[in-house]
């Protein structure tokens, strides 16, 4: 990480490093869903090399501008940025070898649409490598409603793990492989609840956060089309 631009490191709000288990190869085309400040774009760009291509998609113009600055500082010329939603990617059918995403899909209400779109843009045998936030059980309806009312960081849209992985498999993905699971500590939970920052995300009630301690996990997984 020492060679990553300091701005990209400062803007990083992920829950893992999907490029570390995406099995990226030289010359591949990669789509990064919700690229944010660009740290995973840079890591992926270096892995696929000058003959490869990395496309970063984000709906927030300010994040794309910051990602552009970070990519320019990195010196990479194989990274492209595009405004848009992760449910509608500017790629043709079968146009990508890999789709990565880092702590973003939990924020999207229609997760099935995201994975249908990832399936569409991947070539046969292509893969997803995802870091995301899930819960170990179904949360109390009132508690979930309060999180969703504030869309509390990465907690507001987190699904129960089994239901989430089942949804992905139902869209057609196979060979599901869980790389790692990590139960968030109370301190990590607080940070995730206010991602990307207190200026953007209101703080959830302390008692609501206490109610989900031990029930929120980051997971890293890979699957193939």
Which residues make up each language-model segment?
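A short SAM/SAH-binding and catalytic strip from SAM-dependent methyltransferases
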Residues: 97-110
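A short acidic, Gly/Pro-enriched loop at the edge of an enzyme's catalytic core
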Residues: 87-98
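Class I SAM-dependent methyltransferase SAM/SAH-binding core
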Residues: 17, 26-88, 113
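C-terminal lobe and adjacent flexible extensions of AdoMet/dcAdoMet transferase-like proteins
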Residues: 171-225
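A short glycine-rich, Lys/Arg-flanked "PGG" loop and its adjoining helix->strand segment in the class I
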Residues: 112-127
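Class I SAM-dependent transferase core
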Residues: 1-31, 207
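Short alpha-helix
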Residues: 156-172
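Short, glycine-/aromatic-enriched active-site segment of Class I SAM-dependent methyltransferases
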Residues: 134-155
């Amino acid at each position: 990480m020492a060679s990553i631009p300091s701005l990209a490191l400062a803007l990083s709000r992920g829950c893992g490093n999907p490029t570390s288990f995406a099995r990226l190869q030289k010359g591949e085309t990669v789509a990064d869903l919700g690229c944010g400040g660009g740290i995973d774009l840079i890591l992926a760009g270096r892995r696929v090399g000058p003959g490869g291509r990395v496309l970063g998609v984000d709906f927030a113009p300010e994040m794309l501008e910051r990602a552009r600055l970070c990519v320019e500082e990195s010196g990479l010329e194989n990274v492209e940025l595009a405004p848009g939603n992760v449910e509608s990617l500017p790629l043709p059918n079968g146009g990508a070898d890999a789709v990565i995403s880092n702590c973003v899909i939990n924020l999207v209400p229609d997760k099935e649409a995201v994975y249908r779109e990832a399936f569409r843009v991947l070539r046969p045998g292509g893969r997803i490598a995802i870091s995301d936030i899930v819960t170990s059980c179904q949360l109390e309806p009132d508690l979930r409603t309060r999180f969703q009312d504030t869309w509390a960081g990465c907690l507001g849209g987190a699904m129960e793990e089994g239901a989430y992985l089942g949804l992905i498999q139902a869209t057609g993905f196979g060979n599901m492989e869980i790389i790692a699971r990590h139960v968030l500590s109370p301190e990590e939970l607080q940070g995730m609840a206010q991602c990307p920052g207190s200026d953007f995300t209101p703080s959830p009630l302390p008692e609501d956060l206490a109610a989900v301690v031990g029930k929120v996990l980051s997971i890293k997984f890979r699957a193939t089309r």
